[in-house]
Amino acid sequence: MNPRLACSTWLPLLLVLFTLDQGRANPVERGQEYRSLSKRFDDDSTELILEPRASEENGPPYQPLVPRASDENVPPAYVPLVPRASDENVPPPPLQMPLIPRASEQKGPPFNPPPFVDYEPRAANENALRKLIKRSFERSPGRNKRLSPGDGCFGQKIDRIGAVSGMGCNSVSSQGKK
């Protein structure tokens, strides 16, 4: 399919659709007064509340779903749990809620972990671990190759490729000298 043909067909069609009412997200018909969404929501919600349902016509009178605050449901006024000792002239708050006593200032005994069988000090374990790591690092295969890459300015493999191609650091060019 030719892309120019597709563009020339679909572009006018899209322009026509977007200029008509059907192409918009919320089309407003001509002559219709536009109300904001919040006003529409308020109007709809009041209509739903005021219109009785068929099942409610013979039933009990309408009661709101959310209970109103009564004297029984009101929480008690805020009372601090521990009175402050900063100002002694202030009268104590009314005792609507019982006060929680302060914790004692005595501290418990310090925690001593139970002794382990064959327990060694940590320093001995650290030294043994260091020795083990050092031995394994010294014996690792290919360690010498990694630390000394070769005589060239790159690695061994790149130096070999450079020597063969005549473009490496250690390559001798015999073509220029005659």
Curated annotation (Swiss-Prot):
InterPro entries, A to Z: Natr_peptide (IPR000663), Natr_peptide_CS (IPR030480), Natriuretic_peptide (IPR050787), Natriuretic_peptide_brain (IPR002408)
Keywords assigned: Bradykinin receptor impairing toxin, Cleavage on pair of basic residues, Disulfide bond, G-protein coupled receptor impairing toxin, Hypotensive agent, Secreted, Signal, Toxin, Vasoactive
Biological process terms in GO annotation: blood vessel diameter maintenance; cGMP biosynthetic process; cGMP-mediated signaling; negative regulation of systemic arterial blood pressure; neuropeptide signaling pathway; receptor guanylyl cyclase signaling pathway
Propeptide feature ranges: 26-58, 69-73, 85-89, 103-112, 123-146
Location relative to the cell: Secreted
GO cellular component: cytoplasm; extracellular space
Region feature (Disordered): 69-107, 135-155
Function: Helokinestatins antagonize the vasodilatory actions of bradykinin at the B2 bradykinin receptor (BDKRB2), with helokinestatin-1 being the most potent antagonist.
Matching PANTHER family: ATRIAL NATRIURETIC FACTOR PRECURSOR (PTHR14066), NATRIURETIC PEPTIDES B (PTHR14066:SF10)
Listed name of the protein: Natriuretic and helokinestatin peptides
